[in-house]
């Protein structure tokens, strides 16, 4: 991507480019930081790079926004980094889906939105505020192009739509908690009549679980369908997040007396699990939320997030849900819609169209829980959040109990390592 950005800068002598990254990436993923640093240091002086550390300890900047000339913007779940490329087919052994070293990359499911007009301008305002907060520099609003910007080959799904922009921002310094995304999620769940459809990398947010649980307890409440990855990207992440997911699934299943709850992971034609990184909630055919926010506590009140939302009877909303599920099930959209019309139930439609041998959806089963996972789930050390009542702790991030528990976890790890060394040096006869 660096070579592409450099080429664009060379082609457009007046272009200024601003790259803003979370400062925690220096520690968490230093390799992903190097391309941006290289562009800034060795590239054009019109490429400006900054690290943003204005967040509580342990939090991160998770918004995924690209804006151009105040007139075009992307907002969604896709990071501008490696190993994110794939097609909707998620073909097995696709030679184009490779890592930097040439090794195969796993199938990846992600979603973003593109927009022009006032919505793009509002996202530009948000981005300039983020830059000013990080650097102290106020960027001028650029002149709007005479002609609208829209990439060739990108289909338009709707025109003249009213878009809401929702944020999560943790309390920090003199800033109070902003939990617009959580509030919109809860309002949408409460208003649902027929179906709540969710795609998310995680499924651990307590407030969302409580809201879904209340709807499943109702005699005539909505169906709830969740699409998640089968497993996390590391064993530690599995322990930190998917033990919590176990607990959420157990709670929802315990109140699901009408058999209206399902949680799946997608597979391709070779039965490879497709990693789900998309962040979407669609309620009935009237509300869609799409952006950077997962269904976890961090996204509700600890990290910075940005979603866009659309509300109202709109073909775009129903078509998006049909397109996503038709993709996961490996069928055409028309076939999916006809089956849904016949059943009038999303779960029944999935049951009929789901293939056990080809591309399809598989039920997520409870994972075994180890000691580390139980500690992380009990403390929510890796999935913490602020609530509106906790502004007094703004800027402190991890609480003292979390620091103590990190020390305990490190001690457990060291003891385990010493035991492993002892066993290697004293094998059983």
Question: Regions from the language model: what does each represent?
Answer:
Residues 1-429:
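Charged, low-complexity intrinsically disordered terminal segments
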